[in-house]
C-alpha cells in the first residue's frame, strides 16, 4: 500500500507543478496531452483506491491559485472544467452513459461547439451594464480582470435589446486570432522583447497584464458559450436558444455552433471541424458536445469537477515531447542559414516528426536550448514542426550548447549577421551551391544582365547537369553544350550564345544589380554606380564611405561591404571581367556646369512610365547632373510621377515636394 501512496503523492505533486506553470505563470512546460495523461493516471489510481483520495487532489478541483497581484473575485456559481474524450469509442461510451442515466429511449439532441484554445472568463452584467470580469482561477475564486476585459472590443460594455436580466453572468473564452499572434511576435522580435510560444500563451499574457493599456494594444477577441448567474430574468430552455439570445444582446457567439440529433451526426461535425481547423484563423483543440435541453442538463447534474451533460472531444495532440539529438544548419536559396533540430522521432498530430525548425540564433537563445534537451514539439496543420519550449525540469546531465557556424556549411564563405536582423546569411552568393539557381536566375534577368532567351528552366538544367557553377561559367557555354539540354536545338542554342555575347556590354549599375548583393535593388545599384564611378573604388569603400551614398544606411552598407570582402565573390567578378563583360567609362558630371533644371537635384521616380523605360529615364537624369533616389524624404527636390503612382507620391504631397508628370519630364529633357 505504501508504493501506491507514493505513486499518488508523486502524481499529485507533478500535476500541481504543471497547473501552477499553466494557470499562474502562463508558461506551460508540457503539452496538454501529457497533462491529460497524468490526470487520467491519477484518476484511475484513485478509482482503484478511493480511501486514498484527498480533498486537495488535482482530481478534485479545476485549476491553481490566482495571482496575488490581482484582487480576487469569488464565483457565486463555480466555473468547472469539462471531462475529455480522445477517440470515437470514448465518445460513444459517454453518449451511452448519458442515455442510461436519463433512462429514456428518446433521442438526444446535442449542441456542438468549437473548443477554443484561450482563457476562460466570467463577465457579470447588472441591468445590462458590464460590472466585473474574472478568470476561472481555481474554479471558485478568480482574478479580477475587469479593467482589461473592458479594453476588448468584441465584448460589449452594455447589452442591447429587451428583456435583459437584472444580473447575468456570461462565460466564454478570450483568445487571440493567428494573425494577431503573429503581429505581436513580430513586434516583440523587432523590439527585443519576449516572444510567445503560441496564441494561448499570448492571450493569457495579454489578458493578465497589470497595465490595461498594454492589453488594449493586443487584438484579443471573445466568444460566449455559457451562463453562470441568472437573476431577475429568463433565458430559453435550450443551450442553443441561450446562445442565440446572447447574440441578440450583442455578445459574440461562434458561427460554427451546430445541433446534432445523433451520435453519428456529432462524429460528422467533429471530423468536419478537424478538416477545417487549419483555415479557421484561430487555435482550437477539439469540439465541445453538450446536451441541448437545459432541463436534461439539470437532471444529469455534475460530478466533482465537471458536468455530466457535456464533454470535450479533443483532436489528436499537436504537441508531444521528445529529445533533441543534434542541431544542423541548412542554407536556403537566399543564403539564410536556418538551424534545424534533429529529433528522436515522435508522432505529432498523426505524423512522424524527426526534424523541427529552430528559426535562428535568437530563437535558440530564447528557448535556452542545448543538444540533448527534452523539448515540446508542436505541429499545427501544414506548419513546419517547431520547438515550443525546453522541459528544463527534466534536462539530462549530458547536454551541450548549440554552436552557430561562422562559415557557410555548404561553401565555406563567411557568415554575416547584420545588427538588427535575426537571420544569419552566407556571404558567398556567387559561389554557394545552395543559392546557385536563384542567384543565376537573377543574374540573367531582364533588369540585370538581360540575357534574352535564358529562362528559369534553362538555368535549372544547367545547374542540375553541373554545366554552370558561377555566373562566369555562363559566358563559357558553347552551342554544342547547350544542345544537350531538353528542348534545345542547334538554332536555339546559338541564339542563347549570341544573347550572352550581347549581354557582355552593359552598365555599371546593371552589373552591380546582377551580382545579387542583399538589399541592393536597381535604385541602390544606380546610386552606388553614380557615386563611386568605378568598380575598384566601390570594392575599396569602407562602411562609412558607403553610407554617404543617398538612401544607403548601415544595413545596406554592411551587406555591400561584406559582399566585396568575401574573396570568392571578388574571384568570380574577376572571371566575369576576364570573359569580356564591360561598361562605358564613367562620365564625371559637375552639376554646377550643366544648364539643366535637373542638375544638382535629388529626384525620385514613381509609378509606370509609358514613353520611356525607367532605366533610360534614370540614365538621362544622372547624365544631366541629378541624383536619382529610391525613396522620398525631406532631402528630395522633385518627384516624377508616372501612372498608378502610390505611396511615394502621397508622401511627396504630404511633404510639399514638387511633383511633375512624365510628359513634363520629357519636355524638360528635350525629348
UniProtKB/Swiss-Prot annotation:
The EC number on file is 6.5.1.2
Q: SUPFAM superfamilies in the record, alphabetically?
A: BRCT domain, DNA ligase/mRNA capping enzyme, catalytic domain, Nucleic acid-binding proteins, RuvA domain 2-like
Instruction: Answer yes or no on keyword Metal-binding.
Output: yes
Q: Which residues bind Zn(2+)?
A: 408, 411, 426, 432
SMART domains recorded for this chain?
A: BRCT, HhH1, LIGANc
What PROSITE patterns does its record include?
Answer: BRCT, DNA_LIGASE_N1, DNA_LIGASE_N2
- CC terms in the record's Gene Ontology section: cytosol
Residues in BRCT domain copies? 593-671
Q: Which GO terms fall under molecular function for this chain's record?
A: DNA binding; DNA ligase (NAD+) activity; metal ion binding
Functional summary from the UniProt entry = DNA ligase that catalyzes the formation of phosphodiester linkages between 5'-phosphoryl and 3'-hydroxyl groups in double-stranded DNA using NAD as a coenzyme and as the energy source for the reaction. It is essential for DNA replication and repair of damaged DNA.
Q: What is this protein called?
A: DNA ligase
Q: Which gene encodes it?
A: ligA
